[in-house]
């Protein structure tokens, strides 16, 4: 019998998750179906309940419902509790298990696919929203030399630094405080690239040894990556690899099989080109 999975969001028509999971299933010999589920704001619980009642086995959650999924789950992993957000729900034995695979997806893309160790590196993350909250704990697990969050509203960055202090030291600053400082890894976790804009970074943050990573994926260079390229950053990467890696972790949670990701990432980049 084919097991049913889906991704739920609003909007959802743009999601590449069905393509990714169908390729994972084909490669690992798993019998699943995977679809997109649209939910009106305020109807997340109703739509999920209907999905479970129809025999659904698991859900991926995208914007704007990761907080709803966190509250919906009856059992949470440590990384989901740290993020206070869930992107993977599993329905088993009458319970709802919540996990967050965003951070491990980012770390695997950087460390394994890009072959750029995080341990001992100076890491800068731009933004202080949900995207940052979802990845801080796995990054801190890698033991960077330092981890700095920069945000227009410093108090939001400070709140995150305080929340994650039990996992490691996190510095919170405004963008102006980055003047005269450089970093080994700079991660853009703001939504500026979606609006064809750029965070207000001072010059000098990037060096020829810097990995510039935009969590948004694009067919061309985002404004953030264009800026990094113009300042001679050593390596540029968008978030497509993270998307595939977080999906692979979800797939492994559901199916007990760890799919190979590089081929799927390359296929997806061709599809999006």
Curated annotation (Swiss-Prot):
Pathway the protein acts in: Metabolic intermediate biosynthesis; chorismate biosynthesis; chorismate from D-erythrose 4-phosphate and phosphoenolpyruvate: step 4/7
Chain segments annotated as transmembrane: none
Catalysis performed (reactions): shikimate + NADP(+) = 3-dehydroshikimate + NADPH + H(+)
Family membership: Belongs to the shikimate dehydrogenase family.
Organism (species): Chromobacterium violaceum (strain ATCC 12472 / DSM 30191 / JCM 1249 / CCUG 213 / NBRC 12614 / NCIMB 9131 / NCTC 9757 / MK)
Job description of the protein: Involved in the biosynthesis of the chorismate, which leads to the biosynthesis of aromatic amino acids. Catalyzes the reversible NADPH linked reduction of 3-dehydroshikimate (DHSA) to yield shikimate (SA).
Entry-linked Pfam families: SDH_C, Shikimate_DH, Shikimate_dh_N
E.C. no: 1.1.1.25
Alphabetically ordered keywords of this record: Amino-acid biosynthesis, Aromatic amino acid biosynthesis, NADP, Oxidoreductase
Positions that bind shikimate: 15-17, 62, 87, 102, 217
Record: residues binding NADP(+): 78, 127-131, 151-156, 215, 239
Domain of life: Bacteria
GO cellular component assignments: cytosol
Single GO MF annotation: NADP binding
Annotated protein name in UniProt: Shikimate dehydrogenase (NADP(+))
Annotated InterPro entries: Aminoacid_DH-like_N_sf (IPR046346), NAD(P)-bd_dom_sf (IPR036291), SDH_C (IPR041121), Shikimate_DH (IPR011342), Shikimate_DH-bd_N (IPR013708), Shikimate_DH_fam (IPR022893), Shikm_DH/Glu-tRNA_Rdtase (IPR006151)
GO BP field: amino acid biosynthetic process; aromatic amino acid family biosynthetic process; chorismate biosynthetic process; shikimate metabolic process
Summary of subunit composition and partner proteins: Homodimer.
Signal sequence interval, chain numbering: none
Source taxonomy: Bacteria, Pseudomonadati, Pseudomonadota, Betaproteobacteria, Neisseriales
Coiled-coil intervals: none
Active site (record annotation): 66 (proton acceptor)
């Amino acid at each position: 019998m084919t097991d049913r999975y889906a991704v739920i969001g609003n909007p959802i028509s743009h999601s590449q998750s069905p393509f990714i999971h169908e390729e994972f299933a084909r490669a690992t010999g798993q019998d699943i179906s995977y679809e997109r589920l649209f939910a009106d704001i305020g109807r997340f619980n109703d739509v999920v309940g209907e999905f479970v009642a129809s025999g659904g086995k698991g859900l991926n959650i995208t914007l704007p419902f990761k907080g709803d999924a966190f509250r919906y789950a009856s059992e949470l992993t440590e990384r989901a509790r740290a993020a206070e957000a869930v992107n993977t729900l599993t329905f088993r034995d009458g319970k709802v298990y919540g996990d967050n695979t965003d951070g491990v997806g980012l770390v695997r893309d950087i460390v394994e696919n890009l072959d750029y160790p995080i341990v001992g590196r100076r890491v800068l993350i731009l933004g202080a929203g949900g995207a940052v909250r979802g990845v801080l704990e796995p990054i801190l697990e890698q033991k960077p030399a330092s981890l700095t969050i920069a945000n227009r509203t410093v108090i939001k960055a400070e709140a995150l630094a305080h929340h994650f202090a039990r996992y490691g030291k996190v510095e919170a600053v405004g963008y102006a405080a980055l003047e005269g400082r450089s970093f080994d890894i700079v991660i853009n976790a703001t939504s500026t690239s979606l609006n064809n804009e750029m965070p207000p970074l001072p010059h000098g943050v990037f060096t020829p040894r810097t990995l510039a990573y935009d969590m948004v994926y694009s067919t061309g260079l985002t404004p953030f990556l264009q800026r990094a390229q113009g300042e001679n950053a050593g390596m540029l990467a968008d978030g497509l690899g993270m998307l595939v890696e977080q999906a692979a972790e979800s797939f492994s949670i559901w199916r007990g099989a760890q799919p190979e990701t590089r081929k799927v990432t390359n296929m997806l980049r061709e599809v999006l080109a």
